Amino acid sequence: MSFPYQHTSRSQVQPPLAAPGLSMFAPVSSSNSANSASSVAALLSHAPMYGLGQRRPSFLPGVSVPDTLSVRSGFSIPSSSHHPSAVPSLLSQHRLQQPQPRLYPSAPLNYYWPSYQSVPSAAPPPPSQQRYMPDSAVAYNPNQDQFGNSVNVSAACNNVSAPLIANNCAPSFYQSRHPVADVPVTNNTATTTSETDNTIPGNLNMPSVANVQQRISPVCKTNMEDQEETVYTGGVAAKLDYKMDQMVEYLSIMTCKLYARFLNNAQMHSLANSLPGLVFSFRKVVTQILTSTRLPRASCLLALSYLSDRLDAASQTTDFVNQWTKESLFFQICALLTTALILANKFLDDNTFTNQSWSQVTGFRTALLNSFEQDWLASMSWNLSPGPRGQKAWEWWSASYSLFTSSNATYSGEQKTYSPTTLSTNAPPSPSSGRSCSNCNYYYPYTPVGYYPVYNRYAMT
């Protein structure tokens, strides 16, 4: 389509209400609108010719098209911009360009996985405003602080209840269990034995202090800090030995990084580069699993150890690579982490959950979980015992998690100050005392040569 071009020296009349500084983009009052260059520009201005961020076409020689056009009106071309050397044949050479879809630039790899090299400058939002919340109701109400329910104690201190789901008065699993220890009932009198003094603090007059149903919530407002810390090695932890948001973040990042290393070893770099975009969605799945199962830290770290060994051995197997790459990437990481948590929980405490329970939590069919577990056990020769090598792996994963929590400290209640180079006192000492944390290999445990593959070659930072 071509437009005849005729130069005219007709003076253009600007409307009196034109915005100051934008008079050149105001509508034109012209009688000869069919042959004037202003009518051509006004015609072209009604349809978007180019998208945001693309090079704008030069439809008319000597005419500059502005970047942004007024929504309420078109634009005109002043008489000074009419070039006398314009040739009508030049207009037919310019095709109407179709608007191209905007290609969003890929985010840098360190956008989703920030480097936790220093203490955050500002405190994060309270737990009630955290962004990693499950959409559906879970076993423990996530709307409470630290993903737990507060314990309801009556005025007589003899009715302790902590419902698993809001507005549910039915007796729960924990309310039907026997007390952990036989604590003698006292009537607000001073205790006489040293054993009772160590069990019940003097300022806590509750007869069932060691009962599971009282210690069911991690945000109990009573003086639970005075009790002796209980170390959980498996099963459902009544009092978690980690912060929920930190463990969710750590499991999400480490699972994606371990699987990215597996894909890079299998020469699937394009799939590995797409993993950072799945971290945000994967956090919701991990939150759903941890809040429903209440697994202790030992089960989570052992699952990562199983997952690392499994992927390292399977990266050299063609059948495993072909089988897992048929599914979507999100399905792969969810299935692998779920299977690793199942095996870790069954190794530490085989009396807690069945595969049917895991199916209700994760959404996978029970037959599919059975198939995942059978294939995993066959690759491990049906031996879940860590052994000497597994003990060393446990030490490395514990040190890695301590580094992660100390450098990514959160604020719950009181503000706490952490040093990015100081490990937690409860964690085992790091065996790599002479090593320093590199920027590209911060989350992985540092191991001697020959134990784990060198992580900095596959780390995605």
Curated annotation (Swiss-Prot):
Species assigned in the record: Schizosaccharomyces pombe (strain 972 / ATCC 24843) (Fission yeast)
GO molecular function: cyclin-dependent protein serine/threonine kinase regulator activity; protein kinase binding
Residue ranges, compositional bias (Low complexity): 75-92
Keywords: Meiosis, Nucleus
PANTHER family: PHO85 CYCLIN CLG1, PTHR15615
Record-given protein name: Meiotically up-regulated gene 80 protein
Compartments where located: Nucleus
Task performed by this protein: Has a role in meiosis.
GO biological process: meiotic cell cycle; negative regulation of sister chromatid cohesion; positive regulation of macroautophagy; signaling
Keyword Nucleus: yes
A cellular component annotation (GO) from this entry: nucleus
Record region (Disordered): 75-98
